[in-house]
Every structure is written in C-alpha cells, then in structure tokens.
Amino acid sequence: APLKVYIAGKITGDPEYKRKFLSAHMEQKNEGHIVLNPAHLPEGMKSADYMRICLAMIDSADLVAFLPGWESSAGARIEHEYCRYTGKRMKMLGETGDDN
C-alpha cells in the first residue's frame, strides 16, 4: 500500500517555496506515495489556521518528509517537535528531494 507522505518545509519568506514543494511532491508521487502538500492550501488565512490544518494532515500521514532548510521555519520546527512528541515517522530530504 502507498504511504501517505506530508511534506514539511519553509513556506513563509521563501519565494521559491512552490518550486521546492512541487519537486518534493513529484518525487514522492513517483515513488508511489500519496502526497499531503501544505503548499496547495489557499492563501490568505492566519498562521494559526495553517498550523491547525497542517497538524491534522500530519496526523493523517504515515511519514513526514522535511525539506532542506526546514529549521529556519517556525512552522516546520513546530511540526518537527509535534512529530517527535507523537512518535510520527520522519525523514529528511536532500537538496534534490532525495533521501539524505
């Protein structure tokens, strides 16, 4: 069965985020996974709204894949801590979207 993979990374303040998330999205999809991509959420909501939605997506995911540079995102750091706290499986992606 395919894994449900949530992509975590920096969105706010990164003008390249759509390209980075799309690249990781396609990589995971090509591996046969179902991709949960927060870059596809509508714009214009408050950060707390996004976090609530993203944590629900993480709860539904089998695995959370972190993009390079996630540490510089307050939201992704919360997601990482949430994964650690709840025992969610995680992996770090390399610069190309490949596993490190």
Question: What are these model-derived regions, one by one?
Answer:
Residues 1-100:
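Conserved catalytic or regulatory cores that recognize and/or transform ribose-phosphate-containing ligands
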